[in-house]
Amino acid sequence: MAEFRFRPTTLLFLIVALIFRCAIDPVSANADLTPSPRLLRDLVQFDATQTVAHTLSNSPSASSSSAEATVHPAASAEASAISNHTTDNAASAESSAESKHELPSIMSFIGPAAAGVLAIVLIGAVIAFKYRSSK
């Protein structure tokens, strides 16, 4: 009699394991393995370089009249390097922003679902143990 009681439970475990196995394989095969930088870090670096470029463009040597316009090659190279760095950061921030706003995948539901199934199984085991020990 006890053997018949556990047969549906065993079938249920096999079905759940099969569902998890089929759901994990396609998602893990399509997973992106390249690490993406954090968006907040990119925004902070972008703001800092943008501020530096803004202060360089508003400095007295850059805003002098055309008669006094003697730009040092090192200063212009530094300003162009900073502007190139800000465009690189802007491009990386845009690319990381595009990849961050995707819909949740199956993998984000596997953990909570497995925890829920495990909790239900443990509660059922405790109830079955108490029921058997009371007889």
Swiss-Prot record:
Domain of life according to the entry: Eukaryota
Annotated transmembrane regions: 109-129
Motif range (RxLR): 38-41
Record's GO cellular component terms: extracellular region; host cell membrane; membrane
Glycosylation site list: N84
Record region (Disordered): 56-97
Keyword NADP attributed: no
Protein's cellular compartments: Secreted; Host membrane
Topology with respect to the bilayer: Single-pass type I membrane protein
Keyword Transferase: no
Keywords: Glycoprotein, Host membrane, Membrane, Secreted, Signal, Transmembrane, Transmembrane helix
Residues of the signal peptide: 1-29
Main localization category: secreted
Biased composition (Low complexity): 57-69
Family indicated by similarity: Belongs to the RxLR effector family.
Protein's job: Secreted effector that inhibits stress-induced relocalization of the transcription factor NAC069 to the nucleus, thus affecting its broad role in abiotic and biotic stress responses.
Free-text note regarding domains: Has the canonical translocation RxLR motif, but lacks the canonical EER motif, which characterizes most oomycete effectors identified so far.
Subunit structure, as described in the record: Interacts with host transcription factor NAC069.
Protein name: Secreted RxLR effector protein BLR08
